[in-house]
């Protein structure tokens, strides 16, 4: 969504920070430290947007959200898609999350948000230059360390994100290689594409 939003702003003629950056998603992992890092070159967010969307939910307590999620999945599913709410499901597998982001708006300061998901968070300005977009570093719980293994991440990406129109790289290897054939005219499709789909 962040990349689509940036493309939309660019098509409108908006003056965008770091406009030379390719639109892409990069995923890294460290199976020794049990971390996953997800970065995009999308629209990013401002400090105010971070507080309004992620911070407000933190104040109300992601611990309560996770409790509701485990007790009554149907009721919670109605709000999962809202910005911020779905993000908090990361704390089902993470003991800490750090978000670093810089808005596409040229004069905005980059910010860092940090939380253990228990209701409090820290937000601070980032000194130095970082590129437009967002990086999320996930510190996994010991019992969920399998998600920091390459084969597991690759499997998840291929299952849930194979048809994303932007490239997704896992440790510099493009993972989403199947094009969304439903977007192509039938006359342009090859039998191999159809069979692979």
Region roles according to the model:
Residues 103, 120-197:
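ATP-binding catalytic core of ATPases
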Residues 1-142, 146-147, 155:
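GHKL (Bergerat-fold) ATPase N-terminal catalytic module, capturing the glycine-rich phosphate-binding loop
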């Amino acid at each position: 969504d962040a990349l689509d939003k940036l493309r939309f702003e660019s098509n409108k003629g908006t003056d965008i920070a770091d406009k030379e950056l390719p639109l892409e998603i990069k995923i890294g992992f460290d199976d020794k430290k049990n971390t996953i890092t997800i970065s995009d070159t999308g629209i990013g967010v401002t400090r105010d947007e971070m507080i309004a969307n992620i911070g407000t939910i933190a104040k109300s307590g992601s611990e309560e959200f996770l409790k509701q999620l485990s007790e009554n999945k149907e009721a919670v599913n109605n709000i999962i898609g809202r910005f911020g709410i779905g993000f908090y499901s990361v704390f089902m597998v993470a003991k800490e999350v750090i978000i670093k982001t810089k808005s596409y708006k040229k004069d905005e300061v980059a910010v860092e948000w940090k939380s253990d998901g228990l209701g409090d968070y820290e937000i601070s300005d980032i000194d130095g230059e970082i590129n437009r977009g967002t990086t999320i570093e996930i510190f996994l719980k010991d019992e969920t360390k399998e998600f920091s293994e390459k084969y597991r991440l690759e499997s998840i990406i291929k299952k849930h994100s194979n048809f994303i129109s932007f490239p997704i790289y896992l440790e510099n290897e493009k993972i989403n290689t199947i094009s969304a054939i439903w977007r192509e005219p039938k006359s342009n499709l090859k039998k191999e594409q159809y069979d692979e789909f």
